[in-house]
Amino acid sequence: MIHTMRYLLCLLFCLLAGVAQAAPAGKAYMSIIIDDLGQSPDRDSRTLALPGPVTMAIMPDTPHASDFARQAHKAGKTVILHMPMDPATGPYAWHPGIAIDELARRLEAALAKVPYAAGINNHMGSRMTAQREPMAWLMGELQQRHLFFVDSRTSAATVAAAEAQRIS
């Protein structure tokens, strides 16, 4: 299963970098993720005009989340859910101490607000990404859904990558 996770992580980097073919030796690629989207139609539409493979990270509790996700998908951009995590607030936010079934409900509701999400990244989330049990559950859930996770690395104590690698 470690090989499966490595494959999924490799696939993630290829998707985000927009690599359609093998990269020549020595050539570097950079992935760009713009987050906090879904709040302002004017600002959000400007991000769609950016050239190349730019990933749009959309917050589920914003007024234009669903519409912008559809627009971004139609424009050929990769869409991801910008999942609110502690200390973020709101109806979708994850906080330490919330039961897994409630975290699952919030994830399901957030994904419903951001159609075409190919994966998720954490909005804030320093305390949440340091929690082993929720991160282990999340990595397993994302694997079942064929979604990826990009850790915003808002904390040196994050266990997200370690839990993703432990999936067997």
Language model features with spans:
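Catalytic-site microenvironment of enzymes
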Residues: 6-9, 22-168
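N-terminal secretory signal peptides that target proteins for export/translocation
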Residues: 1-5
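Hydrophobic h-region of N-terminal signal peptides that target proteins for export
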Residues: 13-22
